[in-house]
């Protein structure tokens, strides 16, 4: 079956009595150009700087000051974020281990296998999981796991994959990304992540300080990854057609914060979570007696949050999720 043929995808669903589940985000990608864009973005070797950003410390005091002006964020304006942003043309060695969450009918899975990847695909729908095994049966380079990806992430099944490529389900996509990335510092998270998500989610992930759409997810992701919006994908490229458009997003580990200890990471999570829960408040009001600042959460860069986390020290660890 040609998985980029709308008529063939529809015929398979009809003949098998399969009805795409909106709750599970079963909107199947049926556009060859969009598919190739995802695969091309995924199989470019990341350019990782060997330099790392030291954890910034300030004098130990009960109240730490932050200016309203922020230093430039790694995932901000220096990275292309428009639909026509060119990707570097690079010949590279293909990664051997690739994680895919929510493969659906297997259009991405098939493309990854064709390009030489060894794929572990996690599919929640048992009908689609069985179909994937039958249609793309490749015991040497394809493993299909049935169940909830969040459970597999928590039990460590998803650790150790250098590459993750997924058309993430709309309702759970952000949570899946955060759960994967939060394992950095304790376990091995992917060096490169290429995902297809709602455009509004993509914009939040890539937003730099000062942006109205900057939020907790973007700050969390940018702590360890540079973010690039590769291109937009119209709703017409899916069947069934979703209500809104999507975007291909590429995340590459920058390793600048690798020397941030577990306490700093936990404090960072606690600070940012609490700050964005009260995003319209000035930080001085949210953290009375701890931080002196008239800035609001979205106005701080990741470097600012890192400096605060290192200066404040371990606290709030039980609440950082």
Language model: regions and residue ranges:
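Catalytic cores of RNA-modifying enzymes
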Residues: 1-57, 62, 66, 71-76, ...
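C-terminal lobe and adjacent flexible extensions of AdoMet/dcAdoMet transferase-like proteins
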Residues: 272-321
């Amino acid at each position: 079956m040609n998985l980029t043929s709308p008529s063939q995808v529809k015929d398979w669903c009809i003949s098998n009595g399969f009805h795409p589940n909106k709750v599970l985000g079963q909107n199947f990608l049926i556009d060859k150009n969009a598919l190739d864009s995802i695969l091309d973005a995924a199989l470019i070797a990341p350019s990782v700087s060997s330099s790392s950003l030291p954890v910034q410390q300030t004098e130990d005091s009960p109240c730490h000051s932050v200016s309203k002006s922020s230093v430039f964020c790694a995932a901000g304006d220096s990275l292309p974020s428009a639909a026509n942003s060119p990707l570097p043309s690079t010949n590279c060695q293909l990664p051997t281990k690739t994680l895919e969450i929510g493969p659906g009918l297997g259009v991405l899975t098939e493309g990854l296998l064709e390009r030489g990847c060894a794929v572990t695909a996690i599919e929640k729908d048992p009908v689609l999981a069985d179909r994937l095994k039958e249609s793309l049966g490749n015991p040497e380079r394809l493993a299909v796991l049935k169940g909830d990806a969040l459970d597999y992430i928590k039990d460590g099944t998803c650790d150790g994959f250098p590459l993750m490529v997924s058309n993430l389900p709309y309702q759970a996509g952000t949570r899946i990304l955060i759960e994967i990335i939060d394992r950095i510092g304790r376990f091995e998270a992917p060096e490169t992540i290429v995902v297809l998500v709602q455009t509004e989610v993509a914009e939040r992930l890539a937003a730099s300080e000062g942006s109205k759409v900057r939020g907790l997810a973007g700050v969390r992701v940018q702590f360890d990854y540079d973010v690039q919006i590769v291109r937009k994908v119209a709703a017409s490229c899916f069947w069934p057609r979703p209500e809104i458009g999507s975007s291909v997003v590429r995340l590459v580990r920058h390793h600048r914060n690798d020397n941030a200890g577990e306490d700093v990471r936990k404090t960072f999570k606690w600070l940012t979570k609490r700050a964005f829960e009260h995003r319209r408040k000035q930080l001085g009001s949210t953290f009375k007696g701890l931080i002196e600042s008239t800035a609001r959460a979205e106005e701080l860069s990741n470097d600012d949050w890192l400096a605060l986390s290192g200066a404040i020290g371990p606290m709030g660890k039980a609440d950082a999720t």
